[in-house]
Every structure is written in C-alpha cells, then in structure tokens.
Amino acid sequence: MTASGVPTAGRVTKEWAAEFPGFDAWKSLHLLRRIGPVVQGICLDRTTGDDGYLPTVHVHALTREFPVVSLMLGQRSARPSGMPDPVLFARHERDFAHAVGALREQSRLPLDELPSIDEIVRQYHAEARRRLEKGHGAAVPEMEDSVLVAAAAGRDELAGEGLVLARELSASWPKSSMPFDWPGSDAWLDGLAVRAGDRESLLSVVRGQAIAHKLGKIRDHLAPDGVRHDRLA
C-alpha cells in the first residue's frame, strides 16, 4: 500500500494470485499456469491512463516461436453492456471481489479447475468459427495453435479434427483477410499437417519457448506422459 492508500501493483498481483492458487505470478500484474504445450493466463492489463487495470483471461501456445506471451482467446472483463470493466487502483479494495467474480463467470475456460487440452483446443475451434461468422477474417493463428497444441500433447485424433476444420473454414475465408505471405490453402494445410506429425520437433519448440519466456517458476500441470495434475497445491 502506498502512502496515498492506493495499493501497489505488487500487492494487487498477490491478491489475485491468492484467489487463483492454480496460477503462479509470472510478472507484475500477470498470472500464468502451464498445461503442457500451452499456458493459460490472467493478465491485469493496465488502463490507458495507468490508473487501473482490466482483468483479461487468455491462452498462449508454446508450439510457435513468438517474442512475447500473446493474449490469444483473450476475454476482457466486461459490463452487461459489453463495455470493458476496468478496476481503478484507488478502488481496488472496494471492487476486487466483484472483479474476481465477474472474471470467473465470464471466462469460457475454467479458472478454478484445470482446463483439459481438449477444452482449450475446442475453444480455439469455437473462436475460429466466431471470427468467420462475425466477418472478422481468417483465423490462421487460432487454427494453427489448435492443431499444434493437440499434436504436441499427443492428441493425434484431436489434431486431426483441427486439420479437418481448418480445411473447412479456410475455404470460406475472404481473400482480403489473408496474411500477405499466404501460400494458399492447400500448401498451408499440407505444411501444418507436416508440423503436427513431427511431435519431437514440436516439443523442442515448446522447451525453447518455456526458456525464452522464463517459465521456470511456472508450474506445469501436465506431466510429460500427458497425465494432468488435478491437485493444484
């Protein structure tokens, strides 16, 4: 607590971590938990004026080389109107319990229980479908992550489902929304299938990304053999 009575970012981080003991504090205002080849996060994203934070849940796949932990499948805490629902640091003590409850209720993935690889992958699938339905363009990263996370976790059948869905959706993606270096659907799907079929290379990328993002202190709740650790002590 500062002299003005406004809680520090460190205290806010600790209080959120206490509410969600399955997560670990990764950085200031950012909690993570690792589930094998993917991390699930609670990011207390600072507001533009730096006087508050916006609770945001997300996931990030470790199966792609990426310079930062992304906010994929991000869901910001929202009011009934759909507008963002930030928490001012000056009102944190008053609004904290409401913010925690709202995030729990709104998150599509469980926060108190450990989501399975299946649940996470199917949320990628659902997001890809939503993007197409709403006209938001191609969901290339979502579909790639869904396939590669499943493959890295040894869920070959689930990865296969993702490849089938990727073929179905990519046929309807508007050309104007495709990445500038798009090789074409067939070449993309063939390349994705090859990457999914090389689990050892995927696991090597996962290990490298865990080191690059300094995840050593973040517990991995999925054992190397794919068995989940349901007791989050």
Locate predicted features.
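Short, surface-exposed loop/strand segments
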Residues: G5-A9, R34-V39, G49
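Intrinsically disordered, low-complexity regulatory regions enriched in serine/threonine/proline
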Residues: V38, C43-A233
